[in-house]
């Protein structure tokens, strides 16, 4: 809508005067009020061509108001501003009085127009002001102006309207919006040439909207209006009467065969093809639904329920799916409208008419008329769920569903009673398909791979639907008739899937042997310390720059396109033994495109001084100062990987002091400008492409390992290597494909043909191909990495817990889910899709990994396409979220506020806060706890990054994974409502006070991982007597044991623990060395003392323990000797802050630690260490830190043939000397070329 020319000129003049002036909030309020009045007047003037505007006085009052403005107000206002040079507070007061007086004069005279509609027709001609669009624009202006009154709550504002009147305005707004939606619906469905009935309806709509706007304008707002002819209560009553008599769109001016019936009948006769967006469609359903509420809600409740369901689900349909059903929906909406308006017409004539009388009068069979609406409602609801399901998912979802079906039928037997038979059939059907799903996982490369995977995905999608139906039944969100029909359709579809499987003989031929067979495809042998291929000349030159060159600090910048191997090359140099031994400190960080300055500093400090010494609560500038002081006296090597901008180097370089001691920094970047900007002495290195020989050697190495390729394969292999464009990333990805295939020429030729046409022109093509050949059980695991954008390293323990909670891991009888998940990961590593960044020293298991940026971005984009993952940025608008499929199975966010998009995500399965945000550190995110209740299907909630919640959401029955910071010292007993929970990680900012754990936690029998710092059971007697065992619990962290009995009790309740971290206090059995029997499967034990005592009150008995850490205790040789008798499988022993008794002496006898591989002593008060020759026969690593009282390392370490590594830091000279003697003996006498000695001198 545009202003009338006269008004527009005056408005422009006024705004020009106000533009450069300063004015108060009160003045601004009055200016806005003035503009609000002008906007109403402009609309009324636009209606001057219609007879009804003159008849009711609308045109007359509007024109008079304009004359008043031109003759009095405009000159007064402009003159005042010119004179005073500012906006006085009373500027509009006099003019406002004039306006109100004029309104009073016309209020009593104004009446609803009686001119026949035919005389007021809106004609859709060349004049755009006479069209349905014009009607909607008029309504939009009225709605916008009325919304202003709804938003103002300040009683001093000129716009203020009391609350009881706001309720009336709110109802007016609702009616205007419904009327506007109906106009939109009719105009969208009309044929190109407008029909008489439609144009009559447009006029009717325009008259109604204009009339209500005039009434509102004449009476509101009332603030500051003295000598009113109506009191506020009378104005309120006027609105009530008006609402009853005039505005209801269901009450037409023409009774019987009214406008609404006429226009709907006209549309029904010629329903056109779908044209417009689905948003208008869902809103249009509101019209007959609302009419039902007003007129016949007592007799038409079922119809009302169906139309509400239709409205609520339309918004969740993608455009393409909606347009497919649009014509049918048009028919349903029109039929519903005709039915309702016809029934209302009869009832209005005769108030006591019953439903049967109406049916006879109209010749209707109401149940039969409602049936098509039922069908459409069901189809739309079903489609709204199906079209938003993930296109890929883990095959473990059926396992989760089957467990839940049993639990739900037990917990909600009354609600599910009417579906009991169908649910039992579905459960039986899914159980019968379990062997087939095992085949899909264990034989991914058989000849029926594509068919099997298609069927598997269909099965998983049906499992999702069953879950939704069961939940809807329990929560009474969908009528029973719809649920029964849905489950019956699911049963029939599962039957069809089974028939398809059996038709192709996949069940009969392969299921018989699947249980007895373990596939080698699930896992691979870990590849340790792989030698880098290629770039030998480059490595030698860079090594020389690192070890020699300028005496001052130097930056070695490596730049080049993605996939060249910059990071691999830099890491190769960073871990080179000759390089590492040259520097006192080595530290690295990965920047990426999105980074946190504090995270970078923490990463560097953890490498420089050890993770345990880093104070994470410090601010970034404090951490930077700590890093600078740590590096200053030493020669250091820093690796800064993947720098995108000069500003990153500006942030970091102040932390790297130049002590003129040949310190070096390796920097990798894609951009030459960044490399040049960071360079100091050495010129940036532009990393070249591989040559043909290097390309082939890398491909051969990745496919065959230490073996060589046959001559027949080499010919086609050389061609494939050349096709990769001399890009190392492409080569290793293709090698990952080839390594999964038979070593046959035909297979390799097929790969060459698949790659040949597009790999050179599209770098993503090879990634697409690598993804395409993945087995379906690995696709979701791989795409899940897209959630970790900007993460330097991904901890495997966390990744695997998330995979399990997401149902990506298919269970296998006799195997732990964690072990299966590790097999999946090794498979992805073997395909060169995942890079290992850290392995455990003792057993070689992967501890951390990362993806190349190219692969990471692919995962993010493809996961969005597959509706698996939706990454939402904090500044992303709600509209952008709605543009995606609203029910992506996973949602990841960096937003401060979940409110804006939570309403569209009720079916989301996961919410993860993936990056630190200062907002979260400043204050609790109170909204989160309440908003999370909207995510009723939530299975994973990871609020790890300093999101403090004010209470634990316990109404999420599907939740399997919860990580958050909490503010309270106790946990509610209602936490047991989270009966599906498997991982529970709750942190507190302060751990001074113990957290009380309710006894109901022990009812959560599915728990596998429990981490709560410094917790203590609330009711120990209840724990002993009433609670079940937590048989699935494998990791328990930070219980506080005040007595040995408490520890014994908890250990009895957790018989299958594998990892335990705890604090102990009690002094019982101090001199008796009472043996505390830990669970038989326990492999990792970390014990910390409380501040109250030093001695360990028990002897540790754990026959399968492999890792033991003791911190802060008083120990003696006798205690350690007795403990060692029960720990014959111990591989790692770490003693921190330990005080040795017996004159600070430790005697280790023969055979005491027969399997020990790693021994670490840090800040221990040990002076004399006596070790028998055969005490550590398999020791590989010895680390001594802060052992300043130790006299020397026993000489028997010279003869330990398995020894590979000794690290000495902050110890006296005699210890350093003995370490060097051991090195000499190991290397020169025993030719132990793998032995490495690291000496770190601490400067204060």
UniProtKB/Swiss-Prot annotation:
Its main location: cytoplasm. Gene3D superfamilies: Helical domain of apoptotic protease-activating factors, P-loop containing nucleotide triphosphate hydrolases, Ribonuclease Inhibitor, Winged helix-like DNA-binding domain superfamily/Winged helix DNA-binding domain. One of its GO terms (biological process) is plant-type hypersensitive response. CDD domains: RX-CC_like. Residues 411-434, 526-548 form a coiled coil. One of its GO terms (molecular function) is ATP binding. Belongs to the disease resistance NB-LRR family. LRR repeats lie at residues 978-1004, 1079-1103, 1127-1150, 1153-1178, 1213-1237. Confers resistance to late blight (Phytophthora infestans) races carrying the avirulence gene Avr1. Resistance proteins guard the plant against pathogens that contain an appropriate avirulence protein via an indirect interaction with this avirulence protein. That triggers a defense system including the hypersensitive response, which restricts the pathogen growth. This is Putative late blight resistance protein homolog R1A-4. It is a peripheral membrane protein. One of its GO terms (cellular component) is cytoplasm.
């Amino acid at each position: 809508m545009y202003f009338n020319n006269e008004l527009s000129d005056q408005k422009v003049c006024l705004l020009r005067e106000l533009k450069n002036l300063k004015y108060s909030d009160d003045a601004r309020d009055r200016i806005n009020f003035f503009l609000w009045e002008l906007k109403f007047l402009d609309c009324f003037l636009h209606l001057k061509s219609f007879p009804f505007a003159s008849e009711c006085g609308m045109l007359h009052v509007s024109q008079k108001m304009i004359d008043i403005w031109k003759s009095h107000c405009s000159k007064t206002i402009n003159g005042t501003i010119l004179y005073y040079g500012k906006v006085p507070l009373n500027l509009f007061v006099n003019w406002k009085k004039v306006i109100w007086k004029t309104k009073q004069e016309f209020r009593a005279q104004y009446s609803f127009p009686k001119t026949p509609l035919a005389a007021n027709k809106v004609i859709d001609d060349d004049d755009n002001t006479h069209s349905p669009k014009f009607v909607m624009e008029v309504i939009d202006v009225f709605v916008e102006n009325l919304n202003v009154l709804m938003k103002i709550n300040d009683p001093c504002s000129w716009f203020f309207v009391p609350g009881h009147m706001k309720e009336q305005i709110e109802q007016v707004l609702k009616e205007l919006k419904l009327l506007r939606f109906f106009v939109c619906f009719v105009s969208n469905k009309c044929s190109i040439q407008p029909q008489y009935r439609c144009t009559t309806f447009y006029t009717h709509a325009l008259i109604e909207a204009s009339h209500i706007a005039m009434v509102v304008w004449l009476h509101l707002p009332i603030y500051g209006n003295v000598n009113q002819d109506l009191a506020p209560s009378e104005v309120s009553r006027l609105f009530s009467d008006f609402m009853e008599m005039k505005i209801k769109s269901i009450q037409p001016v023409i009774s019987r065969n009214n406008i609404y019936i006429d226009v709907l009948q006209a549309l029904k006769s010629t329903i056109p093809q779908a044209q417009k967006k689905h948003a208008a469609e869902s809103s249009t359903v509101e019209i007959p639904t609302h009419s039902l509420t007003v007129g016949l809600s007592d007799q038409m409740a079922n119809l009302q329920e169906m139309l509400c369901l239709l409205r609520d689900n339309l918004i969740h349909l993608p455009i393409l799916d909606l347009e497919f059903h649009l014509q049918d929906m048009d028919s349903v909406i029109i039929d519903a409208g005709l039915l309702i308006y016809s029934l209302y017409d009869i009832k209005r004539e005769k108030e006591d008419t019953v439903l049967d009388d109406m049916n006879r009068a109209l010749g209707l069979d109401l149940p039969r008329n409602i049936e098509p609406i039922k069908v459409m409602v069901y189809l739309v609801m079903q489609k709204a769920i199906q079209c938003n399901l993930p296109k890929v998912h883990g095959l473990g979802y059926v396992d989760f569903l089957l467990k839940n079906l049993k639990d739900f039928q037990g917990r909600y037997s009354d609600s599910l009673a009417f579906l009991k038979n169908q649910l039992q059939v579905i459960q039986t059907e899914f159980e019968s398909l379990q062997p087939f799903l095992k085949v899909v996982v264990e034989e991914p490369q058989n000849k029926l791979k594509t068919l099997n995977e298609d069927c598997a995905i269909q099965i998983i999608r049906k499992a999702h639907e069953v879950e939704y139906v069961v939940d809807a039944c329990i929560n009474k969100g969908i009528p029973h008739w719809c649920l029964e029909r849905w489950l019956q359709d699911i049963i029939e579809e599962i039957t069809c899937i089974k028939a398809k499987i059996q038709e192709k003989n996949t069940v009969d031929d392969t299921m018989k042997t699947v249980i007895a067979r373990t596939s080698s495809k699930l896992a691979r042998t870990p590849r340790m310390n792989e030698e880098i291929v290629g770039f030998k000349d480059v490595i030698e030159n860079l090594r020389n720059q690192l070890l020699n060159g300028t005496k001052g600090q130097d930056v070695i910048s490596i730049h080049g396109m993605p996939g060249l191997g910059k990071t691999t090359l830099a890491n190769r140099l960073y871990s080179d033994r000759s390089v590492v031994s040259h520097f006192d400190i080595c530290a690295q960080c990965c920047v990426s495109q999105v980074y946190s300055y504090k995270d970078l500093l923490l990463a560097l400090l953890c490498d420089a001084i050890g993770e345990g010494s880093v104070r994470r609560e410090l601010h970034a500038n404090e951490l930077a100062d700590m890093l600078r002081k740590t590096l200053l006296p030493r020669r250091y090597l820093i690796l800064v990987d993947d720098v995108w901008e000069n500003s990153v180097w500006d942030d970091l370089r102040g932390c790297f002091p130049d002590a003129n001691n040949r310190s070096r920094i390796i920097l990798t970047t894609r951009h030459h400008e960044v490399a040049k900007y960071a360079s100091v002495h050495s010129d940036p290195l532009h990393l070249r492409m591989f040559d043909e020989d290097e390309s082939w050697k890398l491909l051969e190495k990745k496919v065959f390992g230490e073996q060589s390729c046959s001559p027949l394969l080499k010919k086609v292999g050389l061609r494939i290597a050349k096709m990769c464009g001399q890009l190392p990333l492409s080569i290793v990805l293709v090698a990952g494909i080839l390594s999964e295939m038979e070593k046959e020429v035909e297979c390799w030729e097929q790969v060459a043909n698949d790659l040949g046409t597009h790999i050179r022109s599209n770098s993503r093509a090879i990634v697409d191909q690598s993804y395409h050949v993945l087995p379906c059980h690995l696709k979701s695991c791989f795409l899940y990495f897209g959630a970790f954008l900007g993460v330097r390293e991904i901890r495997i323990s966390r990744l695997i817990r998330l995979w399990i909670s997401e149902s990506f891991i298919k269970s296998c009888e006799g195997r732990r889910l964690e072990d299966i998940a590790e097999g999946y990961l090794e498979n992805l590593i073997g395909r060169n899709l995942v890079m290992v960044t850290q392995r455990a020293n003792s057993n070689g298991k992967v501890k951390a990994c990362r993806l190349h940026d190219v692969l990471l971005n692919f995962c993010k984009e493809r996961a969005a396409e597959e509706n698996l993952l939706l990454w939402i940025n904090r500044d992303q608008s709600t509209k952008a979220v709605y543009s995606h499929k609203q029910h992506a199975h996973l949602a990841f966010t960096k937003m401060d506020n979940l409110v804006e998009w939570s309403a569209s995500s009720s079916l989301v399965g996961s919410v993860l806060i993936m990056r630190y945000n200062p907002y979260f550190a400043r204050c609790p995110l109170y909204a989160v706890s309440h908003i999370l209740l909207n995510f009723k299907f939530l299975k994973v909630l990871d609020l790890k990054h300093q999101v403090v919640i004010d209470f634990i959401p316990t109404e999420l029955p599907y939740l399997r994974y919860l990580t958050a910071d909490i503010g309270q010292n106790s946990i509610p007993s209602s936490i047991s409502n989270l009966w599906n929970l498997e991982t529970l990680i709750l942190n507190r900012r302060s751990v001074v006070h113990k957290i009380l754990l309710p006894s109901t936690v022990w009812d959560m029998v599915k728990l596998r991982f429990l981490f709560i710092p410094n917790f203590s059971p609330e009711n120990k007697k209840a724990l002993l007597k009433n609670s079940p065992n937590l048989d699935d619990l494998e990791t328990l962290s930070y219980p506080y044991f005040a007595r040995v009995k408490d520890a014994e009790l908890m250990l009895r309740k957790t018989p299958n623990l594998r990892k335990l971290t705890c604090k102990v206090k009690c002094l019982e059995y101090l001199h008796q060395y009472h043996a505390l029997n830990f669970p038989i499967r326990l492999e990792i034990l970390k014990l910390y003392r409380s501040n109250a005592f030093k001695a360990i009150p028990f002897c540790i008995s754990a026959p399968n323990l492999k890792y033991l850490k003791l911190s802060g205790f008083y120990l003696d040789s006798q205690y350690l000797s007795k403990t060692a008798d029960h720990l014959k499988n111990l591989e790692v022993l770490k003693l921190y802050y330990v005080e040795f008794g017996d004159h600070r002496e430790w005697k280790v006898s023969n055979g005491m630690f027969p399997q020990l591989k790693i021994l670490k002593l840090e800040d221990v008060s040990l002076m004399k260490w006596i070790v028998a020759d055969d005490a550590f026969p398999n020791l590989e690593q010895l680390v001594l830190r802060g052992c300043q009282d130790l006299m020397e390392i026993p000489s028997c370490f010279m003869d330990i043939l398995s020894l590979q590594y000794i690290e000495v830091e902050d110890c006296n000279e005699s210890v350093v000397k003995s370490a060097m003697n051991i090195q000499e003996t190991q290397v020169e006498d025993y030719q132990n070329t793998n032995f490495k000695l690291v000496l770190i001198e601490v400067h204060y």
